[in-house]
Amino acid sequence: MKGFKLSCTASNSNRSTPACSPILRKRSRSPTPQNQDGDTMVEKGSDHSSDKSPSTPEQGVQRSCSSQSGRSGGKNSKKSQSWYNVLSPTYKQRNEDFRKLFKQLPDTERLIVDYSCALQRDILLQGRLYLSENWICFYSNIFRWETLLTVRLKDICSMTKEKTARLIPNAIQVCTDSEKHFFTSFGARDRTYMMMFRLWQNALLEKPLCPKELWHFVHQCYGNELGLTSDDEDYVPPDDDFNTMGYCEEIPVEENEVNDSSSKSSIETKPDASPQLPKKSITNSTLTSTGSSEAPVSFDGLPLEEEALEGDGSLEKELAIDNIMGEKIEMIAPVNSPSLDFNDNEDIPTELSDSSDTHDEGEVQAFYEDLSGRQYVNEVFNFSVDKLYDLLFTNSPFQRDFMEQRRFSDIIFHPWKKEENGNQSRVILYTITLTNPLAPKTATVRETQTMYKASQESECYVIDAEVLTHDVPYHDYFYTINRYTLTRVARNKSRLRVSTELRYRKQPWGLVKTFIEKNFWSGLEDYFRHLESELAKTESTYLAEMHRQSPKEKASKTTTVRRRKRPHAHLRVPHLEEVMSPVTTPTDEDVGHRIKHVAGSTQTRHIPEDTPNGFHLQSVSKLLLVISCVICFSLVLLVILNMMLFYKLWMLEYTTQTLTAWQGLRLQERLPQSQTEWAQLLESQQKYHDTELQKWREIIKSSVMLLDQMKDSLINLQNGIRSRDYTSESEEKRNRYH
């Protein structure tokens, strides 16, 4: 498969034709045929579809050739075609349909992406929008009535986002000097607009897409399975780390052929990388090449001399340039150095040191840039780069303690394995605890870490971690990429940069996307802030242990370092001596007043010391207590207000029922005009009179009853008083007689 890709992508291949060559395609961005205007629109019935003919004989020849070449594998492809290919055609089928529908376009135009949408005319014409590198095309077929529209990107004056019926944001308007085209019913309007705007920008700037960038867009829109065959010779596989934000410069055919041949030969002669990482020290055997005066090239495309002397000033660069031009540099080799190999090619200098511990040429530049998302960590630590790698990417006590603090459980570390492309990867499985009320309490995570083969011990490590979180809402829509870049700054200093990117497998709706990104960025910020603080604590502990060493050990280390550097005194370069001088161990004050470098500038800023962890937790607990009290008080207040509102509504309903009886007495706005209306009014008045009379009768009746009860009570009271008077008189009489 590897050889097949090389044979397909090489521009000097015997099978490539001028019409299909991607280089000639870029250089021959010729104007369209003469019978073609800036934008054309054709409407016709399907019975005239057979009249579509190529505008030029050359196009007809190219199509006939392509059809003949595709016949060889046509039967097999039809037999092996799955049922879902009929419902979801591949990119190859889409591109063939695009060429059949728009025969008036040049054959160099290749479909990049197509979208389902509608064109607004007298009615909405539902169809598909096709985007190529220089054209916007639309095709619709409604009840066998076809509509074709082609607009050249260079002729577009403006491109704006619009709303259907001034309410639904799913439309794009494209304006030329003479016409306006309103496309609506897009499923993902913003993504479509960004693609159209990018192609329009490239067309106006006359900077066409290079083949890798074009096929990168195709893979982004249609996935990895494009349905291509060996007949598609213009296919160029994009790199995994291909950046689509830059423009590709046009390369002459001769230069491209030379580059392709040289790259092919270098791939064929490249030895397989060992499972272990390449060492930092470079022996003389790797630097010398018999029969060639070219300097070997490192992983980032720079000569090894420039890479080794990078950051040491202009004088060292001049030495490396003089070495490349073949001028001899006098160097006195140490007598007891067994690594030097004296041969005919003595112009190439050997390594500056025979020990990997004495390299202080400056900060190493990473061979990959940061991800396009966000950068959370960019810090220099007083560890060697290998020490930092052991802390983060091995089953170290630091890693276990950190995962325990993050409340990770069911942790499974799989060993590092070497892949076919030379990279090394491993898988880590664990369970995390979630605090989001909309998510479950725990979720399983699968983290795949990939260390690129260009990583070197004691120099640079670049590791990508792909994190898949299961059991969370919309977990099948997205995944996370974290890029850890570890570079050497000095002998005992290294820089850690961590950048992250959120990638989508399926495009979510706007509200869902906002929910995902909000929780994603907040969770990662907390995680990496915790990681940085734990690394700072480990750094302070490590420095404290280093300070406990005896003075004899420090003196012996200093003398050994100086002895290793003595063989390089014959270079007589003052700046090199300063760079190669012994590195002193930083003190605690250096850690306390660390200076953080801002990426992309030379400015520095002071990082204040972190507060104690206990005080921080206490302040957080107090804050949570205050928030809970406020929430409880608010709930009680809401309950009281609801009760008051209920009471007022009940009183209002009671008052309304009481006043309904008085509605008949209100003066109407107009007097009755007919006899019927007068009769209805008199009838209502009579009913109201009878009702009121009945109420008064009941009131009088109840009053009479109360008066009778009062009368009876008074009579009983009077009788009681009389009986008492009678008994008292009789007793007095008896007393008198006795």
From Swiss-Prot:
Biased composition annotated in UniProt, kind: Polar residues: 8-19, 259-268, 281-295
Residue ranges of domain GRAM in the record: 96-163
Listed InterPro entries: Cholesterol_transport, GRAM, PH-like_dom_sf, VASt
Alphabetical list of Gene3D superfamilies matching this protein: Pleckstrin-homology domain (PH domain)/Phosphotyrosine-binding domain (PTB)
Domain VASt: 372-543
GO biological process: cellular response to cholesterol; cholesterol homeostasis; intracellular sterol transport
SMART domains noted in UniProt: GRAM (SM00568)
Cell compartment(s), UniProt: Endoplasmic reticulum membrane; Cell membrane
Residues where Phosphotyrosine is found: Y389
Topological relation to the membrane, as annotated: Single-pass membrane protein
Annotated TM spans: 623-643
Gene Ontology cellular component annotations, sorted alphabetically: endoplasmic reticulum membrane; endoplasmic reticulum-plasma membrane contact site; membrane; plasma membrane
Protein keywords: Cell membrane, Endoplasmic reticulum, Lipid transport, Lipid-binding, Membrane, Phosphoprotein, Transmembrane, Transmembrane helix, Transport
An example Gene Ontology molecular-function term: phosphatidylserine binding
Function text: Cholesterol transporter that mediates non-vesicular transport of cholesterol from the plasma membrane (PM) to the endoplasmic reticulum (ER). Contains unique domains for binding cholesterol and the PM, thereby serving as a molecular bridge for the transfer of cholesterol from the PM to the ER. Plays a crucial role in cholesterol homeostasis in the adrenal gland and has the unique ability to localize to the PM based on the level of membrane cholesterol.
Record-given protein name: Protein Aster-B
